[in-house]
Each structure stands twice: as structure tokens, then as C-alpha cells.
């Protein structure tokens, strides 16, 4: 009897140990799965340059604020210093965002470390310019990242992804035709999510989208349009249904035919709602992530 009890206890311990080693999907994993499975049950919110209204754009503090807010993905801009350090900044020079001046490509990381960031009103803050590696580690398991301007440094970016174990976080985008994408980035396409960016103001854009569907079968397309009379955006809702998610930008009027963030302050249904209901958007990039999240939650389109 005693031996049977010991054997049973050992089996239970083994079972519990095996269960504990099974990895629970992280928040980033869940968002990635939504992309890969073309799940249209909710809307993915992308914060443009992170939460730049409350902290300097592309800063660690803006990233953390976005995570706390419940944002799903960040758009972050990558530059490289004179001594080869990949860091976050939109502009190619220091003037607008720091208390320094000159080109980033002519500035060493040591020189960067002495600078402070400015907020969106030009006020100097105590916050520092982050490296890409710092940002990746902060985002790990917590939020997806769309790296902008990073295709110039693909090999170096991937070395950092391997080092930090964050390859599952990354979305890369570009405006090149499908054949060029395969030729230039082919060895990476099975490791990260790649989304084509297509301006859909004319019929030629439909051919470009079809080429991507045939060649790469992307999980999503970023679509831009400025002509409110164009029939193509509504047509894309049908064309891409069940095949690829649709990403639109509500940052300014020329990207979304006037259905932009500033108008959403007074009319979310006519802006965000229009992009979702009429055009089939399931990924929206915004400069007002808190406003967008509140609207989506009111419609049960976001957790």
C-alpha cells in the first residue's frame, strides 16, 4: 500500500511538473496569432511612434505608456549612429527631438547618451534616446512592433532579434512590388511578418495586391488612399475578406481620405467606425491611441 501511494505521488508530481513547463501564450503571442489566423473579431490598435502625446516619441517612456494603455502594436523608427548602434528616432538629424544638432549618421552613441529628448511641443525633458535593443527588451512578450525605416539595416536588425529573442514581435512593411520583396528579403520572410504597403487610388493597385496574394500571401495589407470617390477601398473589403487583414492609417487626411484622428475627437463613428464598418479595417494606426481604444471597447472590438 505504501509503495502504491509513493508511486501515485510520484506520478502526480511528474504530471504537475510537465504542465508547469508548458508555456502560456504571451500577450504578444496572442496578437501575432490574430494576425496569422486573419481573425476579424477585434481591431488591432497601432500607436504611431508610441504614446507621443504624453512622452517624447519613440522613447521608452512612450512605449511603456502604450503597453499600460493596452495598445497592441507600436510603430517605431530605426536609425543608425556613426559607430553602428541601432537606435530609435524618426528624423535623420538631432535638431527637432533633442538638445543636440547634426546628422545621426555623424553622431556616436556616446555623444547621444549625453542628450535629452524633447516632447512634441519642443520642451526639453529628462528622457533619453533609446537603443533598439533597449526597446526590444522592454516590449518582449508584451506588445508587437512595426519597425519603420529598418529595411536598410535588415541583417543588423535580425542579429538583435536573435540576441534578444524578440523575432516574434516584429512586423516589417514596404512599398516594393512582390517580386522585389522576395528578391531582397526572401531569407527573412519565414521569420517575421511582412506587410505590403499599397496606395489604392487607382485600378493598378488592384493588380499589385493580387500579385502579393499570389506570390507571398501576406497576413495583412497596409492600404492608403486620398480620393474619397475611389471605388477601390470598398472593393478591397470584399477582395481581402478571409485572406488578409486590412490596415489603415488615421494619422492625417491624405492617408484615409479625410477620416483622420483629429476629426475623431468629435466623431468616432464617422472616422474610426467608417474605416471598420465600411472599409473592413481590422488594424488601425493612430496618433490618438487612448481615444481609439475607448471607442473600440465601447463597441466590444477590443479587450
Model segments located where?
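Phosphate-group recognition and catalysis centered on beta-loop-alpha active-site segments
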Residues: 19-303
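Bacterial Sec-dependent N-terminal signal peptides
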Residues: 1-28
Amino acid at each position: 500500500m505504501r509503495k502504491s501511494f509513493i508511486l501515485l505521488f510520484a506520478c502526480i508530481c511528474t504530471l504537475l511538473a510537465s504542465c508547469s513547463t508548458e508555456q502560456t501564450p504571451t500577450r504578444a503571442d496572442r496578437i501575432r496569432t490574430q494576425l496569422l489566423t486573419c481573425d476579424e473579431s477585434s481591431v488591432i490598435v497601432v500607436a504611431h511612434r508610441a504614446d507621443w502625446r504624453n512622452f517624447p516619441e519613440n522613447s521608452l517612456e512612450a512605449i511603456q505608456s502604450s503597453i499600460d494603455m493596452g495598445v497592441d502594436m507600436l510603430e517605431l523608427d530605426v536609425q543608425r549612429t556613426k559607430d553602428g548602434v541601432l537606435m530609435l528616432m524618426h528624423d535623420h538629424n538631432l535638431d527637432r527631438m533633442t538638445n543636440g544638432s547634426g546628422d545621426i549618421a555623424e553622431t556616436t552613441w556616446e555623444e547621444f547618451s549625453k542628450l535629452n529628448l524633447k516632447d512634441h511641443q519642443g520642451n526639453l525633458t529628462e528622457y533619453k534616446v533609446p537603443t533598439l535593443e533597449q526597446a526590444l527588451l522592454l516590449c518582449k512578450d508584451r506588445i508587437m512592433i512595426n519597425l519603420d525605416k529598418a529595411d536598410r539595416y535588415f541583417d543588423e536588425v535580425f542579429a538583435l532579434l536573435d540576441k534578444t529573442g524578440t523575432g516574434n514581435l516584429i512586423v516589417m512593411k514596404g512599398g516594393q512590388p512582390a517580386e522585389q520583396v522576395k528578391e531582397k528579403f526572401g531569407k527573412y520572410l519565414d521569420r517575421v511578418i511582412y506587410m505590403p504597403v499599397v496606395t489604392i487610388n487607382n485600378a493598378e493597385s488592384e493588380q499589385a495586391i493580387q500579385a502579393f496574394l499570389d506570390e507571398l500571401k501576406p497576413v495583412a495589407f497596409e492600404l492608403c488612399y486620398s480620393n474619397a470617390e475611389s471605388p477601390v477601398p470598398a472593393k478591397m473589403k470584399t477582395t481581402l475578406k478571409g485572406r488578409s487583414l486590412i490596415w489603415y492609417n488615421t494619422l492625417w487626411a491624405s492617408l484615409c481620405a479625410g477620416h483622420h484622428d483629429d476629426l475623431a475627437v468629435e466623431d468616432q463613428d464617422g472616422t474610426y467606425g467608417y474605416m471598420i464598418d465600411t472599409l473592413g479595417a481590422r488594424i488601425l494606426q493612430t496618433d490618438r491611441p487612448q481615444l481609439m481604444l475607448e471607442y473600440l471597447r465601447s463597441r466590444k472590438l477590443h479587450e
